[in-house]
Amino acid sequence: MQRKKKGLSILLAGTVALGALAVLPVGEIQAKAAISQQTKGSSLANTVTAATAKQAATDTTAATTNQAIATQLAAKGIDYNKLNKVQQQDIYVDVIVQMSAAPASENGTLRTDYSSTAEIQQETNKVIAAQASVKAAVEQVTQQTAGESYGYVVNGFSTKVRVVDIPKLKQIAGVKTVTLAKVYYPTDAKANSMANVQAVWSNYKYKGEGTVVSVIDSGIDPTHKDMRLSDDKDVKLTKSDVEKFTDTAKHGRYFNSKVPYGFNYADNNDTITDDTVDEQHGMHVAGIIGANGTGDDPAKSVVGVAPEAQLLAMKVFTNSDTSATTGSATLVSAIEDSAKIGADVLNMSLGSDSGNQTLEDPELAAVQNANESGTAAVISAGNSGTSGSATEGVNKDYYGLQDNEMVGTPGTSRGATTVASAENTDVITQAVTITDGTGLQLGPETIQLSSNDFTGSFDQKKFYVVKDASGNLSKGKVADYTADAKGKIAIVKRGELTFADKQKYAQAAGAAGLIIVNNDGTATPVTSMALTTTFPTFGLSSVTGQKLVDWVAAHPDDSLGVKIALTLVPNQKYTEDKMSDFTSYGPVSNLSFKPDITAPGGNIWSTQNNNGYTNMSGTSMASPFIAGSQALLKQALNNKNNPFYAYYKQLKGTALTDFLKTVEMNTAQPINDINYNNVIVSPRRQGAGLVDVKAAIDALEKNPSTVVAENGYPAVELKDFTSTDKTFKLTFTNRTTHELTYQMDSNTDTNAVYTSATDPNSGVLYDKKIDGAAIKAGSNITVPAGKTAQIEFTLSLPKSFDQQQFVEGFLNFKGSDGSRLNLPYMGFFGDWNDGKIVDSLNGITYSPAGGNFGTVPLLTNKNTGTQYYGGMVTDADGNQTVDDQAIAFSSDKNALYNDISMKYYLLRNISNVQVDILDGQGNKVTTLSSSTNRKKTYYNAHSQQYIYYHAPAWDGTYYDQRDGNIKTADDGSYTYRISGVPEGGDKRQVFDVPFKLDSKAPTVRHVALSAKTENGKTQYYLTAEAKDDLSGLDATKSVKTAINEVTNLDATFTDAGTTADGYTKIETPLSDEQAQALGNGDNSAELYLTDNASNATDQDASVQKPGSTSFDLIVNGGGIPDKISSTTTGYEANTQGGGTYTFSGTYPAAVDGTYTDAQGKKHDLNTTYDAATNSFTASMPVTNADYAAQVDLYADKAHTQLLKHFDTKVRLTAPTFTDLKFNNGSDQTSEATIKVTGTVSADTKTVNVGDTVAALDAQHHFSVDVPVNYGDNTIKVTATDEDGNTTTEQKTITSSYDPDMLKNSVTFDQGVTFGANEFNATSAKFYDPKTGIATITGKVKHPTTTLQVDGKQIPIKDDLTFSFTLDLGTLGQKPFGVVVGDTTQNKTFQEALTFILDAVAPTLSLDSSTDAPVYTNNPNFQITGTATDNAQYLSLSINGSSVASQYVDININSGKPGHMAIDQPVKLLEGKNVLTVAVTDSEDNTTTKNITVYYEPKKTLAAPTVTPSTTEPAKTVTLTANSAATGETVQYSADGGKTYQDVPAAGVTVTANGTFKFKSTDLYGNESPAVDYVVTNIKADDPAQLQAAKQELTNLIASAKTLSASGKYDDATTTALAAATQKAQTALDQTNASVDSLTGANRDLQTAINQLAAKLPADKKTSLLNQLQSVKAALETDLGNQTDSSTGKTFTAALDDLVAQAQAGTQTDDQLQATLAKVLDAVLAKLAEGIKAATPAEVGNAKDAATGKTWYADIADTLTSGQASADASDKLAHLQALQSLKTKVAAAVEAAKTVGKGDGTTGTSDKGGGQGTPAPTPGDIGKDKGDEGSQPSSGGNIPTNPATTTSTSTDDTTDRNGQLTSGKGALPKTGETTERPAFGFLGVIVVSLMGVLGLKRKQREE
């Protein structure tokens, strides 16, 4: 809007003031503003009578004065209205005393058009000096020293004065006015003061009027009381403007003048409010930009940076609980709409860590497009510190990395202003103040209260200091409490115990509350404690806590006042580091400069939903600060009174947005590091410095001159360099009308040359000066008015300065007019390529104790999906390391390890990444993965895990090129290789991990027992000799052993030497139980041993006890147990009320025996004996009773030779229930719990009711309340006795109780879930790819549940099932809003169903034949062709190896087709080669084709044998030739070898003497040497011979003419043939022609025929025919049968004609391609015409939500783009896109028929009720999904899902659903939770909504 025209004097003052604003104190500007505001009352005199004028002015002034006093005192914590009248008059206030004399800006001493800073300061000093006499008089009245003096804009000074004395000051001669100093309450007053925002408001009155800022975030609450404009008359976006936009866009709506437009892009509805319960990120961001609160309490009112700016609510995060991330399609739509509707600035406080800078990224491309439209983009840098800070995400480097960047995408966008975070000086937070009512006051100090319910729990309580045994402050142990704690507030020290335990023990001691004193000895508050919320607790710093302890010790019986409230307190973090420790480091990984600038982002107070407020931290808070500031800058540019308005008006597009960014960076103030001698903070951390909004506006109003690097960027990017002298150029632009000269500052701190350093004690990164380094200008810096000057500078480094270090700093320039320019610079001295891309095994990041195993191989068991760390060994001290010689897996399906993959700790972002498996000779076996880029590893604070690169698994199989089948690789040594190029570098790095494929188990021999006696104790060992010929015996030395069936599953072996034939002698100690089981005689031994590949040998042996000479009876398992129960090994129950007990053992002879039953009767045992092994087995029946039994074993059947006697007790009587009742006998309940009661038999030990152990009373009775869920609940009750016998009873109880009727109230069938559902043509049973219709079925929980999808009420059947259809089309991301409600409750919740699909397979056209074999003698075969798809991503595999892929993060809704040119080499094997080529799109639709190639090495064939028909003189001679081998063809030449042709079957008829050459050829292109055969026996000039020669030449001339007329050959050779034909005809016409002349003419003509070149060579023909086949398939029947009006033929017929022409070869490839292009253009036009004709205007003019354009525009754009394509394959891709569009439009038409809308969405149903207003549901803003695999547990295994594969058949279009994955697993604990809160940096991932923080589509191989 236009600003109101100011009075001339004010305008001039404002203009002149520009020269001094760089040195003008903020106080003077505020003084001017206060005076202006509080003297407006005098204007009333112009509108009232003289009689009333005085009274009106007096009343107004009094009211204004009282309000100003009250406001000022409120800021100091004093309630003016509660003071009595005497106190009100006596209290001191701050005032501004203004002099009668004019200030320097108005007294005529300065030029109104231009004055230098020096001149302004000189005149200002004169004005201030003249104030001396007045100041003296004022000080006499106030008894206070005068404060700050002003002389430029205001002639006056500040002072303190009692209210009663204010009139006295007004009476002093020379005093014009006395004005109350105004109090400002911005977003965070301290944050804005850091950036001088108030000065802009005050001096320029810029508050964002007429500007629009787009908030692309989680949503805005437009009803918040601070979301307002002071005046909505002259807004940029009116309601009418918005309605015009929404009429076109077909989405979004107008809300109010402050938030004129909003739309929920994630859920496709108008619910723009974030329903997250804990915190609303977008609302906080919106408040920082433009809240416009009123009132004096900063905790209850917020004013943003640009409070009068309008805000767009572009909600891109769903209200669904299923996802806290967003995707490319959603973001791009919001960005594009922001630009279309006219946003001046867009803010994105979101991103995914460590991004790249490529326009292949759709978000970065969208940002650039927005810039080009003139919308500035401001984006947060990220909250991850450095990649070297391990789990902390702060300003540290524990690994010594050269590449520590973490700036996120889309913040890496070149044109965006990327913002780092500084700490706020003060913070509004919950704080405690402790007073005794007299002299003690502790605080206010920031605290963390266990629950807000306890704010009053500490007030007026007594305190109790808990002391330990030494009399020191206790850490809260139970034993340290006494009875004195009861009812008091206990005070303990931090440490040893968990916070929860401290609370528990204090509560148990009867304390009323707990205060935990920090233990670090500092004043740092304790604000990150894991407290329970059930007991009043908070913490104090060490300093404050000790003061409290001391006071309580002196006043043990006194109570204290404790006030806990929101309070403005100093930010402790600011005193430790002015920058926020979490702010992400730059630069971009290619050494581009980022971040750009810093703003306050740490501890910012801003708005929340429902008129709420909260404190949040993050670059998410810093970014909106800059967005608001750029709105102010844009307002300044729009000010027609600005002296540079004419220049600003012509700025458009990126020129405008770059200018705003440059001005802010040029005027930013570099921050110094208070912890390291005030050196600079690295530009890689702070960018250009802290924003100074006042300085930026000053520049725009006074002198908008700038300095940039040679490439136009407002920072110097030196990249990497190796010379100690580095030159660079700066461009200075003077936009004033006067010449400017600049001097570079020589401050030894700010302007020194710096490099990075690491504090060895803390790991903190800081900058240090490079001694001897300097930067000098090559010439004086003089810039003519209105011109630019390019100046060369030289950076000089000392020769001793080591390479591989950053070099950085700031260049500051002072202009001749006093203006200043700031420019950061940064580069890398050394080779950026050199830094490793991946950490090595056991490398710098390897820290098992911290849960980080770094780079590590993973071995997977396919049956269970469990993963294990490969080669992991543990030394004697318990340290784990990876032994790279022990990494192995087996191709034996029975082995534990069935495949290998790698989890890489990437140290850098890398591009052109390839993962290969190599054999022992370094030959490539397969390529597992090929991708454009991979992101470095970092710790994601939101998901609490490291984000690794999980590379694909190899299962030991390979593609056999000979037959096209998958085969198992041979055992041997292999290499797992990753290679890639570091971003910003150009050299490929390789990292190899060796491993072995071993399918053979180790061999074991000579199993025996040995014994050693140590300290009087005999230790027995199981010994053996073992050998493994490949992977080696298990490096962990783990074995399993059994002695007489007593097992030891955790045994280990030791090496005891090596045999001569290479066996390792091993010995394993027996456990005590195994030793006890040993007997004299044959002991059964079992040794289970594996190799490193997990192949197992299970060796059984019979061993003798060392030293034994007798053979005693041995019963396995240590003998018959003392008790036989249902849990005893060997017992097996039967159905007759008993069972059988079986035992076994060894004895050198048969064993017999007896047993006694329950009645004491003796019976014979059932025994068997194996003489070969000396083993026996015996069994005895037992009954379900408790009784004593005896077992006797004998050496004879007569039972005379007793071997052993056993006494045992049979204990098989199970416990019993009496009077067992479930729910008092009822099967139904409406309660939350049911009661289970009963009595059990006396021998019962425990009763388990579900998961609860019931308490038994003295009568063995129990009663348990069991919670039940809605629906059927099966309740199990199990009684267990002392012997382990159990009895179980169960009952099903149906519960109608449901505390949350809406929780889990809707479930879907066939795998459909709320959130993202991603599928392709064949992977979803609910979807029909032919129609594009999805049929969604499911069930609701209650009959009262209601379900609304996309605005339509879904009918619920009587059986609670439902079914509805959605038209999804064939491609895109389609969100549908879902509202679930219940008719019995007045509430709903909102969810979303999002479908991400591609139902169209890519096309694949190969240049080589796929129908007939190809033969070659060249081992290097090139596969060429093209692939297209309806979306932009394609990947290519050849022979199962992934060889190429495109940028994976695509906008699937862009409508842009995909295209890939194929040109891949393949090394051929000798003989047959089956080459399988497959292309796959973004949703795993795959098209496959095979090429069969036969290859034989090039060789020289044996020469053919030539035989003449006669050697006698003859008229003709027939020459026949035979090849030396079968399969060869003999060719001849009659023209000396110029041309050859096949020898006819009948031979070559020769009519004239001459020399003929013959050679043999084969299919592979091999040839023999040519042999000459000279014909000399033709009789000359024989009339018959002459006639024959004429006839032969006549025939050949006729043949030549036929060939010339065929049109198959190119012009050059056809012309040569015509000339040869004419020459032959001339020879024929000669009357004196001889046989020789005719033969020569014949030979020349034959040569010309042989040299004819086909218009369409064979390879081109094959390629074209394949291409035509693909086109015909894409057209399908309906489109192919339509007629081209220009030709009258169907398109299929036209293609058939092309096929015929290609087969005939009468046109060149270019001609045929041109014709094909015309056909495809006609097809595109016909298809577009048909779509448009079938689309009613109301639908065609409606908006496609995916593209933001009308359907008609989508059709036209796709048609135009397709017809503009030069390549037929591109046209085919656009045809696919148009076909996909056809499906979408048809769906929109169908929807319009039903509900009257045309945007592809549905509106109000005519049956199911109206469009619901979705109620928000919780989401989790700022959470990155860990998208690259889960982490192994510390125990060494990772549970995962088994990998699957799906093969494809020849030339089939198939779906690939089973790509190998590395699995999912449990996350290892990584130590104590970080003590800083999540900072709201929104993680973004795409389409599976997708993995690790976020924006990115799923990675193909993960």
UniProtKB/Swiss-Prot annotation:
Q: Which InterPro entries match?
A: C5a/SBT2-like_Fn3, C5a_Peptidase, Ig-like_fold, LPXTG_anchor, PA_dom_sf, PA_domain, Peptidase_S8/S53_dom, Peptidase_S8/S53_dom_sf
Positions of region (Disordered):
1796-1874
EC class? hydrolase
What range does the record give for the signal peptide? 1-33
Instruction: Specify the protein's topology with respect to the membrane.
Output: Peptidoglycan-anchor
Q: Where in the cell is it found?
A: Secreted, Cell wall
User: Where does it mainly reside?
Assistant: secreted
What keywords are annotated for this sequence in UniProt? Cell wall, Hydrolase, Peptidoglycan-anchor, Plasmid, Protease, Repeat, Secreted, Serine protease, Signal, Zymogen
Q: Output this protein's name.
A: PII-type proteinase
- UniProt motif LPXTG sorting signal: location: 1867-1871
Which GO BP annotation is one of this protein's?
proteolysis
**Which reactions are catalysed by this chain?**
Endopeptidase activity with very broad specificity, although some subsite preference have been noted, e.g. large hydrophobic residues in the P1 and P4 positions, and Pro in the P2 position. Best known for its action on caseins, although it has been shown to hydrolyze hemoglobin and oxidized insulin B-chain
Catalytic positions are D217, H281, S620
Name of one Pfam family that matches = Peptidase_S8
Gly residues bias: where?
1797-1812
Relate the protein's function as given in its record: Protease which breaks down milk proteins during the growth of the bacteria on milk.
Per the record, the gene is prt
**Mind naming one GO cellular-component term on file for this protein?**
membrane
Q: Which PROSITE patterns match?
A: GRAM_POS_ANCHORING, SUBTILASE, SUBTILASE_ASP, SUBTILASE_HIS, SUBTILASE_SER
Propeptide residues? 34-187, 1871-1902
- Pentaglycyl murein peptidoglycan amidated threonine is found on T1870
Q: Does the keyword Protease apply?
A: yes
Task: Determine the domain of life of the protein's source.
Answer: Bacteria
> Is the keyword Thylakoid assigned to this protein?
no
Q: Which GO terms describe its molecular function?
A: serine-type endopeptidase activity
Q: Indicate the segments forming the Peptidase S8 domain, all copies.
A: 191-697
